[in-house]
Amino acid sequence: YMNRKDLKIGVLYSTEESSSPIQVANLKEAAKSYPGMEILDSAVADITTIDAKTTELLSRGADCLVNLLDNTVVGKLETNILPLTNEARIPVFGSEIEQVKIGCLASASIDYITVGKSAGAAAAKILAGTPAGDIPVATITDPTVYYNSRVAAELRIAIPAEPGTDVA
């Protein structure tokens, strides 16, 4: 699905979460590496506008939606966003496994155990006297792929052989 040449990716984000506009900017920058990929973003001022903003992205031709690590938007995923996207047969890609379990198509996400080990290693360095500012920011280099075969069947999307772990 994501291998299409022209792909419009919709992304909802909250203006109340300081990291969300940064995540959108990073997504737009990454999309420049893929000719034909376009990011359609829509800022959500508060939770009462989520339905309208989701519908707006769908009417602008979004081929799929991508969730950021945005608690405001994720909090309305199951009750507001997924019913609208499912009706339109538009997949939503989550940012972590729990979102895939509740109805997103797939996610290349963090492994919380790995994150915990990394945080523990950083804490040990700090306790050993390393200033926190001297410890580099950790990034995910090997995400875990999760998918939901039930959602794929409902949306009539073929899943490639062995893409990751099925959580349906």
Task: Map each language-model feature to its residues.
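Short hydrophobic alpha-helices and adjacent helix-cap/hinge residues
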Residues: 1-168
